[in-house]
Design a protein with these regions (language model features):
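Long, solvent-exposed N-terminal ectodomains/accessory regions
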Residues: 25-176
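Pan-zinc metallopeptidase signature
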Residues: 44-81, 85, 449-510
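Short, ordered, surface-exposed loop/turn motifs in non-cytosolic proteins
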Residues: 54, 61, 71, 227-228, ...
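Short, acidic Ser/Thr/Gly-rich low-complexity loop/linker segments typical of extracellular
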Residues: 254-268
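Auxiliary, metal-adjacent structural segments of Zn-dependent hydrolase domains
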Residues: 322-388
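Short pre-active-site segment immediately N-terminal to the catalytic Zn-binding motif
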Residues: 382-398, 417
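Active-site recognition of the HExxH zinc-binding catalytic motif
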Residues: 396-412, 424-428, 432
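Post-HExxH zinc-binding segment in Zn-dependent metallohydrolases
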Residues: 417-456
Length: 510
């Protein structure tokens, strides 16, 4: 929360701007010949042969028809053919406006890494570009009829056929068994097609197949549809207990099939149904905010690949704790009770969603900062939250920075000329008020421009001689609107609200 010095983060020269809050000195991004391009990580992964490619599905169907018999009861299935159902698309927004328009469609899940690659876990943790002039490249599988927003550059990487999403198989009666030699039902056809496609592309192990024989007949224990579910918690070292992570977006991914669920107040979630093995992923974003892994990569916590198993997970990794704590505070400010305060900017009110960078470095006198000009450029995050030792520190810092964002939203055309003492004292007050809703004994440190004036107007503690009480946080926020100076804010409070202790405001604001 102190002043920043000029920093070199290895980015090309983009701009030098004044940080909107928590800092008064320019942050200059400097040229670095080692900047990574958007596709830098492709060379660190292994491209997989795609079983869902139309060309491979057609080969699989031809193989099934040549090797297996079709029973009389399944005569119609022998006429089944493969047609493109989905498109695997690479998307390259050229600016933040295009990125925001793209991501406004919450029916699609966009990944900043390709879906037909296998990456080591350590590479996935560092995914993204560090080139400040680049918007991330995104990958998605969409129905073939899907229309992308006009003007955004897209490239179809592969035509897909995803049988699990084909209405032809909606009426399958599931037994979990697939006959090895005869197509007698739609379930036999679906299972045989998938098994053959995965075999032809050397992905058979992903199906986790088991064989079963009875007399002259043999079956694959293919498995029926199942609904992924689980519970996400974390150890909160400030509360000294395991707590649920509410409001987190959980993805279940099986190649190009992606479904999602949101954790409830107890951390429980469930998603749509899948068949076979699928990977659980926590993608740390919601409609209005997007937590970044450092400056640019999407923050994710990658869970295991499971088949008919729930994922009950307690977060312990230090980076994942950082993501989870930023999320908990952001989710509170955007979606939960905030005592009638105004929310931070929604996705429709900025060029892109509120980007919050989880900076994994230990702070050098800085807990976090907010730059609206940096965020308005769209490429860089509006907010940065640095590594902390305790969970309540993450929470309070995130609330503080989002309070600046909400203040900016109240009157962005005047915000830059508001006195630092007003900005920081207000954000410090919101930090105290909202953080105590989760950490009841939370206390703030006050110094310089970071005064305790908001707390003093609310609490009944007269021990430090403030002698003001009885105001609420919404009243103080209402009086803050459009006020630029310390005295203007004080006078607006006096003007708008009657209070038996208001005669002591002059002393408090002195």
């Amino acid at each position: 929360m102190k002043k920043l010095t000029t920093l070199n983060y290895g980015f090309p020269v983009l701009f030098a701007v004044l940080i909107g809050s928590c800092n008064t000195e320019p942050v200059l991004t400097e040229n670095n010949a080692n900047a990574r391009g958007k596709e830098y990580y492709l060379q660190l992964g292994q491209k997989l042969e795609n079983p869902y490619a139309v060309k491979n599905m057609r080969k699989a169907l031809d193989s099934v028809k040549s090797k297996m018999k079709f029973s009389k009861s399944a005569k119609n299935t022998s006429e089944f053919d493969i047609e493109t159902s989905h498109l695997y698309v690479k998307i390259e927004p050229k600016n933040a406006d295009e990125e925001a328009v793209l991501k406004r469609d919450t029916s699609q899940v966009f990944f900043d890494y390709p879906l037909d690659y296998e990456f080591p876990e350590e590479v996935l943790q560092q995914m993204g570009t560090n080139d400040a002039e680049s918007i991330s490249t995104y990958y998605v599988a969409v129905p073939k009829e899907y229309v992308f927003p006009a003007g955004i550059k897209t490239e179809v990487l592969e035509e897909l056929y995803i049988p699990e999403q084909d209405p032809y198989f909606d009426d399958v009666t599931e037994t979990g068994q697939v006959n090895k030699s005869t197509i007698g039902t739609k379930e036999d056809l679906l299972g045989s097609l998938l098994i053959e496609a995965f075999k032809l592309t050397n992905n058979e192990k992903e199906l986790g197949l088991e064989s079963w024989t009875a007399g002259k007949s043999s079956w694959w224990m293919f498995g029926s549809k199942w609904r992924p579910s689980g519970k996400i918690t974390m150890f909160d070292n400030s509360l000294n207990k395991v707590v649920p992570v509410e409001g987190a977006q959980i993805l279940i991914r099986q190649w190009f099939t992606v479904d999602s669920g949101i954790t409830d107040v107890n951390g429980n979630f469930s998603t749509g149904t899948v068949r076979g093995q699928a990977r659980y992923i926590i993608q740390w974003e919601r409609q209005h905010y997007d937590i970044r892994n450092g400056w640019f990569g999407q923050a994710e916590t990658r869970g295991p690949s499971k088949k008919k198993e729930s994922w009950n997970y307690t977060i312990t990794d230090v980076d994942d704790i950082q993501y989870a704590m930023i999320h908990r505070a952001a989710h509170h400010y955007y979606y939960k009770d905030i005592k009638e305060l105004r929310r931070p900017p929604f996705d429709s009110e900025m060029p892109s969603r509120m980007k919050i960078a989880a900076i994994h470095d230990l702070p050098n006198g800085l807990n976090g900062d907010t730059s609206f000009w940096r965020g308005l450029a769209g490429v860089l995050p509006t907010i940065r939250i640095y590594k902390r030792n305790n969970c309540h520190e993450y929470y309070g810092t995130t609330i503080h920075e989002l309070a600046h964002a909400s203040h900016w939203k109240m009157g962005w055309w005047t915000f830059q000329s508001v006195e630092d003492k007003v900005k920081e004292s207000w954000a410090r007050g919101v930090q105290w008020e909202l953080t105590r809703m989760v950490y009841p004994i939370y206390t703030n440190e006050y110094f310089g421009d970071y005064t305790g004036v908001v707390q003093d107007m609310i609490d009944k503690d007269y021990s430090i001689g403030d002698n003001v009480t009885g105001y609420n946080i919404r009243q103080i926020e209402n009086a803050l609107m459009y006020q630029k100076t310390w005295n203007d804010w004080k006078n607006k409070i006096k003007q708008d609200y009657e209070n038996t202790t208001e005669n002591n405001l002059d002393q408090l604001f002195s």
